Amino acid sequence: MYQAKRERMIGKKILGERYVTVSEAAEIMYNRAQIGELSYEQGCALDYLQKFAKLDKEEAKKLVEELISLGIDEKTAVKIADILPEDLDDLRAIYYKRELPENAEEILEIVRKYI
C-alpha cells in the first residue's frame, strides 16, 4: 500500500493511502529518484520494481479498473494485475484464504488480454 508522506516526523503527516500496482510503484520511485539521490534500500526497491513490473502503469491501471468493475475488491485487483495469473491454479494462489469467485474464468479472460 502506498502512503503519501509516510514519514511520521514533525511537520509531516499521512495525506492518504491506496493500493498501487508494481508498475505504479516503480514510477513513483523513479520520480523520487529524479528529485534527489535514493538511499541504498530505495535504489534496490526501484531496481526490483523495474525488473518485476509486467505491465506499464496505464495498462495496469486499466486492468485494475476492469477487475473492480467485476466486483473484485481493490486490494485483490491490484494483486491480480501484479501477478497476471494465467490459469485457475495461479488465481487460487491469490485467493488462497477465500473461495474463488464464480466469475473466475471471466477474470482470467480479462487478464489474458494484457498478457
From Swiss-Prot:
Subcellular localization: Cytoplasm
Q: Which species is the source of this protein?
A: Methanocaldococcus jannaschii (strain ATCC 43067 / DSM 2661 / JAL-1 / JCM 10045 / NBRC 100440)
- Which EC number applies? 2.7.7.6
- Supply the Gene3D superfamilies for this chain: 6.10.140.10, HRDC domain
Complex formation? Part of the RNA polymerase complex. Forms a stalk with Rpo7 that extends from the main structure.
Kindly report, in one word, the top-level EC class recorded for this enzyme.
transferase
Name the chemical reaction catalysed here.
RNA(n) + a ribonucleoside 5'-triphosphate = RNA(n+1) + diphosphate
Which keywords does the record carry? Cytoplasm, DNA-directed RNA polymerase, Nucleotidyltransferase, Transcription, Transferase
Sorted alphabetically, the Gene Ontology cellular component annotations on this record are: cytoplasm; DNA-directed RNA polymerase complex
One annotated GO molecular function: nucleotide binding
InterPro entries in the record: HRDC-like_sf, HRDC_dom_sf, Rpb4/RPC9, Rpo4
The biological process GO terms on file are: DNA-templated transcription initiation
* PANTHER family assigned: DNA-DIRECTED RNA POLYMERASE SUBUNIT RPO4, RNA POLYMERASE RPB4
Describe the family membership recorded for this protein in Swiss-Prot or TrEMBL.
Answer: Belongs to the eukaryotic RPB4 RNA polymerase subunit family.
The cross-references to Pfam families, in alphabetical order and at most eight, read:
RNA_pol_Rpb4 (PF03874)
Described by its record, this protein's role is as follows:
DNA-dependent RNA polymerase (RNAP) catalyzes the transcription of DNA into RNA using the four ribonucleoside triphosphates as substrates. This subunit is less well bound than the others.
**Protein name per UniProt:** DNA-directed RNA polymerase subunit Rpo4
Q: Which NCBIfam families match?
A: PRK14981.1-6
